[in-house]
Amino acid sequence: MKEARMLTNPTLDQMQALGLTGMAAAWRELTEQSGTNELSRDEWLGLMLDREVTLRADKRIRNRLASAKLRFAQACIEDIDFAAARGLDRRNTMALAQGQWLTAHEGLIITGHTGTGKSWLACAFGRQAARLGHSVLYVRVPRMFEELALARLDGSFPRLIDRLTRVQLLILDDFGTHTLSDQQRFHLFEIVEERYQRKSTLITAQVPVASWHDLIADSTVADAILDRIVHNAHRITLRGESMRKQKSAPLLTGAENGEINQP
């Protein structure tokens, strides 16, 4: 590979000009390592392409995570503590982490009392979805309704609705903090109708699913919304006292328990 070493500078310039930063980095490392003279041209090219592919994949994940706006940006599946005292099933949780529910456009519902780690767990699944190649968006439901109401006034409603319905995984955090108004019912139905069997939606709530009908208030609209949200959704129920009361306990550790039900 003596000829290759002689062409290092112009070759690097060309790679940088083409945006092949991964290949350029691999080239530099290979030329500095001993023993690389024994590699064939195909082996050099393969190593360089591997680096470029990895770099671009990492960049896409970073971009998806930046767009997701996760509340707990560092939450990840690997950090869940599956202590026996908790009861959160490792097998079922890791099965969900494989992402088949996302490709099948199914939902995920996480319920539990305040402070039990619902939002953190939702963000961990959001990060995992981004790793698997899915676009993700996290929103708090009360804030979403505020933004939708304002969007109707300033003309940006179609653009905001499109953003909420187009993303491959929409995380709706803190659903059920209040009874929905007529406008909020309409907005929620608009979102779930557009997403039904096309995209995946993850919802967290303090109140159990059995109480959601009353929160939506209008019986006909509630039936329509819940039929689209609940029937094809996996469920996780977190139990235990608020983790905010456990001074040194990390998220999803300590006394809470969890159950996962398949749809």
Swiss-Prot record:
- UniProt keyword terms in alphabetical order: ATP-binding, Nucleotide-binding, Plasmid, Transposable element
Q: Which family does it belong to?
A: Belongs to the IS21/IS1162 putative ATP-binding protein family.
* Gene3D superfamilies, alphabetized: P-loop containing nucleotide triphosphate hydrolases (3.40.50.300)
Q: Which organism is it from?
A: Sinorhizobium fredii (strain NBRC 101917 / NGR234)
Recorded GO terms, molecular function?
Answer: ATP binding; ATP hydrolysis activity
Specify the domain of life of the species encoding this protein: Bacteria
A biological process term (GO) from this entry: DNA replication
One Pfam family assigned to this protein is IstB_IS21
Name assigned to this protein: Putative insertion sequence ATP-binding protein y4bM/y4kI/y4tA
Residues bound to ATP are: 112-119
The UniProt entry, under SUPFAM superfamilies, shows: P-loop containing nucleoside triphosphate hydrolases
Q: Give the PANTHER family listed for this entry.
A: ATP-BINDING PROTEIN RV3427C IN INSERTION SEQUENCE-RELATED, CHROMOSOMAL REPLICATION INITIATOR PROTEIN DNAA
